[in-house]
């Protein structure tokens, strides 16, 4: 009987300990993991003279190779800027525009447009200069991997609203984590565009409400939509990303409270979306960029024509296997062992109870037979014989 009790106790202890391990798994720490701190680096990509407004609408264009800010690293935050030589910001309020800058990684093939692009598009910015923060303010351990031999390529458009040329410095601010970076998940950038794989420009309409819808892109893998960076132009009032026709990201572009150098308000921030849900093979992703130029004035060229507009979402997707169902998002690979051990423990426990009850029932019968030959010898026996 004592042996039976020990066996039951052992099984119950194992079941309880395994149950605790399953629910505390997300809190367990690997002592071999190294806590990684983000490093920061500001990079200057040259000083350029931007022509006056009456020359090609004040546009300056640049395409060139540039070095990455780090190698064998994970980039977590990216932002671009335009400055004067004294370090002050050159923006719409003082008549200078970072019209566009787009970074390509020439070491990787673009996942949507392939060879139609010079590399994988992983970061873009307009004059709103919204940072691409893959950590979502430090909430996520997410980054973009840069290999040892990766090379960047940039495509830049600067615009001058003044009628005299302006000298400006093109810069970018990077945050990154160097090896080892095992704490970070790696995102793959996917560029969704209303213009598909052509130029991102699409025609604007004055004093009208209109929208552009991108062709759906069908995915062929499992993953998580970890971060969505959105880009539109002046006149936009709504930007939506859909998966299989259902909205998974909806943002309202924000405008400055003060007029720019041209006397109208301009975009100041286009919010991103994070943790927009899972994707699976066969899912289709598209976006809709909605404009209202009756409320927000579009950009106008020097000859009175409208500048084209855009609708872009750069989505970082963490690729992986099919999701496993769980009741709280934790790791439940202990569920089957728990169920098996619990079943065994309950079976043994029930057997022990049945065995004890039977012994207690049979004891008085045996004792009465014993009394024919000798008297009751212990207090327990005397009690059971009553």
UniProtKB/Swiss-Prot annotation:
Glycans are attached at residue 86. Residues 1-22 form the signal peptide. Pathway: Secondary metabolite biosynthesis. Disulfide bonds: none annotated. Keywords: Copper, Glycoprotein, Membrane, Oxidoreductase, Signal, Transmembrane, Transmembrane helix. GO terms for cellular component: membrane. Probable copper-dependent oxygenase; part of the gene cluster that mediates the biosynthesis of squalestatin S1 (SQS1, also known as zaragozic acid A), a heavily oxidized fungal polyketide that offers potent cholesterol lowering activity by targeting squalene synthase (SS). SQS1 is composed of a 2,8-dioxobicyclic[3.2.1]octane-3,4,5-tricarboxyclic acid core that is connected to two lipophilic polyketide arms. This is Probable copper-dependent oxygenase M1. It comes from Phoma sp. (strain ATCC 20986 / MF5453). The gene is M1.
